[in-house]
């Protein structure tokens, strides 16, 4: 019987434009790109040149600090560009896909009998190990430091987030194979939602299944770690996106790197929100082709509205994004005395508007923050929506002031920027909490290096 963990703190934000639970089409492009910024904490070193031929699974770049950690091409074809930005920062590596795809061949693995070291070695060779993150610091992990536990969260409850059960259909065997492989490395925990009924989740083998019943951000892997096996100083846990678990399973079963995934195209500015089957690195212009109600005054997001990255049609699907969201930008909206109007269509957490009476209402929110940054108000706002055993407001103050000792005492090793996404949404001070937490983690990582 799965362990049920009930959470009271949090906030569900019901937005218009949720994807219907059907895969509308398969999106294919002539060009793909792998973006290093999609792998947090990685300093890329490109190992290919323009004009080189690569197969799907061949390395495009490696982590400069851990050269064994490779990042593989999603397709076979010719490398057409290595784009760089300021100070020669690698922005992306583009590959022109050939019509008939060819895959680099790797060994298959009997995961039930394999050693943990064999699992890690194969993931490193195939360029998939970089999809594993770690706590503390919420960055791509170091393969030389073994974790005390591994966490996979199959619950996606951010606004307009993709339902993993849709992606799981047809990939059940690969998912279970990936879970079994991870369990050979360390004790593995699978977090699912109370409403998720897929047999591959509820009856998952070789892992400990925990059911999380509560509002967003119950699906955040950091929240689940905090309630099951908290991270103390000197300890490491690995966290894995469930889509990556499927990638791992395919590799062990077939010996090929197949980065096909199901992505939600959602948001109020999308004509018919639905799911599409595509590859990591697909151009957003191809994914959103003929899907937008308008190309003007829209915010395109690589990911969900709270934790995703602002993008454009010229960008590519992030390696870890489960959805592409399009909402109104709000830069063409003029409101007269907006703060004093009844505003039944405006979402409010403080009952400032009568909209709180409309339970279950879907809101069409835009990208405006509706106010400027101001002094931090110690009102307990963060604690109401953050179901973790930490003092969130005091931790944020410690990060801002650079008090590392205080940060450690307040639990910074347990948190990720995404854990503060809902708190950032409700924050009266309009602070960029996720950026503040990321900056704090980066400083701490350098101090402890």
Please place each PLM-identified region on the residue numbering.
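Short, solvent-exposed loop/turn positions at domain surfaces
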Residues: 42, 48, 65-68, 272
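Short coil-to-beta-strand transition motifs
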Residues: 68-76
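N-terminal, Lys/Arg-enriched amphipathic/low-complexity engagement segments
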Residues: 1-47, 62, 212
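Glycine-rich, histidine-containing beta strand-loop boundary motifs that form or position
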Residues: 58, 64, 75, 83, ...
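Short, well-structured beta-strand-loop connectors
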Residues: 48-62, 80-81
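Buried, small/hydrophobic-residue-enriched core segments of structured protein domains
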Residues: 69, 83-449
């Amino acid at each position: 019987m799965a362990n049920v963990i009930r959470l009271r703190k949090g906030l569900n934000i019901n937005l218009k434009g949720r994807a219907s639970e059907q895969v509308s089409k398969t999106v294919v492009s002539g060009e793909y790109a792998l973006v290093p910024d999609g792998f947090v904490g990685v300093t890329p070193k490109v190992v290919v040149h323009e004009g080189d031929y690569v197969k799907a699974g061949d390395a495009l770049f490696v982590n400069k600090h851990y050269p064994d950690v490779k990042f593989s091409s999603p397709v076979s074809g010719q490398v057409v560009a290595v784009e760089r930005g300021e100070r020669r920062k690698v922005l992306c590596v583009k590959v022109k896909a050939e019509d008939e795809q060819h895959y680099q061949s790797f060994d298959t693995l009997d995961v039930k009998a394999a050693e943990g070291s064999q699992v890690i070695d194969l993931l490193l060779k195939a360029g998939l190990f970089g999809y594993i993150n770690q706590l503390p610091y919420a960055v791509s992990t170091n393969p030389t430091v073994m974790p005390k536990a591994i966490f996979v969260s199959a619950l996606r409850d951010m606004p307009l987030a993709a339902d993993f059960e849709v992606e799981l259909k047809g990939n059940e065997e690969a998912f279970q194979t990936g879970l079994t492989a991870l369990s050979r490395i360390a004790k593995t925990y699978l977090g699912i939602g109370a409403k998720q009924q897929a047999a591959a989740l509820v009856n998952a083998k070789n892992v400990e299944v925990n059911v999380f019943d509560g509002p967003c951000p119950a699906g955040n892997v950091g929240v689940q770690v905090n309630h099951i096996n908290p991270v103390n100083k000197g300890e490491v846990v690995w966290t894995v996106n469930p889509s990556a678990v499927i990638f791992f399973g395919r590799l062990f079963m077939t010996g090929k790197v197949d980065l096909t995934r199901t992505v939600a195209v959602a948001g109020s500015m999308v004509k018919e929100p639905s799911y599409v089957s595509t590859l990591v690195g697909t151009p957003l212009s191809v994914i959103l082709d003929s899907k937008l109600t308008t190309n003007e005054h829209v915010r395109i997001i690589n990911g969900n509205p709270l934790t995703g990255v602002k993008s454009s049609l010229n960008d590519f699907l992030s390696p870890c994004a489960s959805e592409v969201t399009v909402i109104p930008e709000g830069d063409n909206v003029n409101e007269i005395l907006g703060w004093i109007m009844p505003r039944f269509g405006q979402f409010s957490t403080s009952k400032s508007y009568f909209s709180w009476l409309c339970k279950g209402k879907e809101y069409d929110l835009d990208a405006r923050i509706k106010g400027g940054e101001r002094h931090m108000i110690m009102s307990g706002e963060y604690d109401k929506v953050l179901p973790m055993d930490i003092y969130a407001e005091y931790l944020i103050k410690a990060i801002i002031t650079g008090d590392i000792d205080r940060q450690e005492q307040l639990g910074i090793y347990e948190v990720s920027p995404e854990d503060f996404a809902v708190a950032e949404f409700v924050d009266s001070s309009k602070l960029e909490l996720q950026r503040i937490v990321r900056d704090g983690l980066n400083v701490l990582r350098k101090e402890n290096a």
